[in-house]
């Protein structure tokens, strides 16, 4: 796990990447030097956010004609902010594949590496992706890849348990397979287009893969989402989605695209926002709202956790 000074350095680097316009739009703290230019920054922020559609109709500025079909690919990058250092992931844009896993903290104990199963899943999946010849019409099957990676981890009697998400771009289809509360979302024209649904047994108890006492790969959600050029895919562990709402994520993605941020810059900004939300008291988050709904708690704060964010631009 990274030492606290390293984490602070990472967050400082992320902080420098966040434009003041994004800070205003998202309610983040402005840098001290930005106060004098607040009015101008606010104006820029408003102009960058997506325009609302008229009630009962589509945006009149949208063209009715479909763009000509062409081969799609992804440009992807990631950001990882460790807490217990139990998340792991890989990004392989040349193969059109990104994946992440979150080791279940409930296995944390002396002599037990709670991250072991997650790391085994991602290592096995990555090795198979690297060994697979790219260019097949159907692309890589995320469900088959998850199943193979799981079987290898079970055969090795790997300790721990893990949630996981694997995404693969095949033509104009983003194929997916996931288990548990690690999730992904697709944004189109500055708006949420698709969001995966968390698989949980009960509050804070997600579906998970393990050698024993876990769920089977057959429990994984799988399918495909039709994507097009300009779409943005954001995948993350629960450290992201427990602390950032879909609406907040939508605004960050829209602002990032309007400001021309790269996938890496967007991933950094999203992770930085999630970290700030996870450490801020007196602020409702998806985690606190769900806890209030399911357990009757009254706290208003985020959830400290590893935060993994993968951002892919469809181009």
From Swiss-Prot:
A GO molecular-function annotation: protein serine/threonine phosphatase activity
Binding site for Mn(2+) 2: 102, 238, 305
The protein's Enzyme Commission number: 3.1.3.16
Keyword set includes Secreted: no
Residues given in the record as Mn(2+) 1 binding sites: 102-103
Cofactor binding remark: Binds 2 magnesium or manganese ions per subunit.
InterPro entries in the record: PPM-type-like_dom_sf, PPM-type_phosphatase-like_dom, PPTC7
Keywords, ordered alphabetically: Hydrolase, Magnesium, Manganese, Metal-binding, Protein phosphatase
Record field: catalytic activity: O-phospho-L-seryl-[protein] + H2O = L-seryl-[protein] + phosphate; O-phospho-L-threonyl-[protein] + H2O = L-threonyl-[protein] + phosphate
Ranges of residues in domain PPM-type phosphatase: 71-314
Cofactor(s) named in the record: Mg(2+); Mn(2+)
Main enzyme class: hydrolase
UniProt entry tagged with the keyword Manganese: yes
Taxonomic superkingdom: Eukaryota
Family in the record: Belongs to the PP2C family.
Protein name, entry field: Putative protein phosphatase 2C 24
Naturally occurring in which organism (per UniProt): Oryza sativa subsp. japonica (Rice)
